[in-house]
């Protein structure tokens, strides 16, 4: 059995957050920023489980329309988070590309764009040459794709502990 160091928890707090992954850590951060006394509990080290293995995509593209308002705001936050935290999160706003393997999938992608265009996300429909232009040296199988340049990615093992 592992011997963990003994810690002294505060006698009082406003909120207890259980789990030190990206959601728990960010919840604790913003609650603290709002003036709450927060205790963050994690059974291991921060970002040592699912958040530490995730790819770190912050994407609007392909989301359920119900999720989009939240993801649009999250994307805005991520764009300035390194500066706010004074930390290197390896944030890259390089976009997200979905490649359609067949006409049916391409039609589904185009349907998503049509269903979500009122949100103002700048998703581009690409033919195979457009996909290849975004991925130099890689011949993309398929009939095209969609690309959202405002989507990005951060390094989860750096973001959660920050």
What are these regions (language model features)?
Residues 1-15, 33-34:
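Extreme N-terminal leader/targeting segments of oxidoreductases
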Residues 9-10, 89-98, 132-162:
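Helix-loop-beta segment of a Rossmann-like dinucleotide-binding subdomain
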Residues 19-21, 43:
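Glycine-rich Rossmann-fold phosphate-binding loop(s) that bind the pyrophosphate
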Residues 24:
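N-terminal Rossmann-fold NAD(P) dinucleotide-binding loop
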Residues 32-52:
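Glycine-rich FAD pyrophosphate-binding loop
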Residues 43-48, 86, 133-137:
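Short beta-strand/turn micro-motifs at beta-sheet edges
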Residues 56-134:
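Dinucleotide-binding Rossmann-like beta1-alpha1 core, especially the glycine-rich loop
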């Amino acid at each position: 059995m592992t011997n963990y160091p003994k810690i002294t928890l505060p006698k009082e707090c406003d909120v207890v957050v259980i789990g030190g992954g990206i959601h728990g850590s960010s919840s604790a951060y913003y609650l603290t920023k709002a003036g709450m006394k927060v205790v963050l509990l994690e059974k291991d080290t921060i970002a040592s489980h699912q958040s530490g293995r995730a790819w770190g995509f912050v994407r609007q593209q392909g989301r359920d329309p119900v999720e989009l308002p939240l993801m649009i705001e999250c994307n805005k936050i991520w764009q300035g988070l390194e500066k706010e935290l004074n930390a290197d999160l390896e944030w890259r706003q390089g976009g997200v590309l979905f490649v359609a393997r067949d006409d049916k999938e391409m039609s589904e992608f185009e349907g998503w764009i049509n269903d979500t265009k009122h949100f103002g996300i700048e998703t581009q429909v690409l033919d195979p040459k457009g996909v290849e232009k975004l991925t130099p040296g890689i011949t993309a199988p398929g009939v095209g794709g969609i690309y959202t340049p405002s989507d990005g990615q951060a390094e989860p093992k750096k973001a959660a502990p920050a």
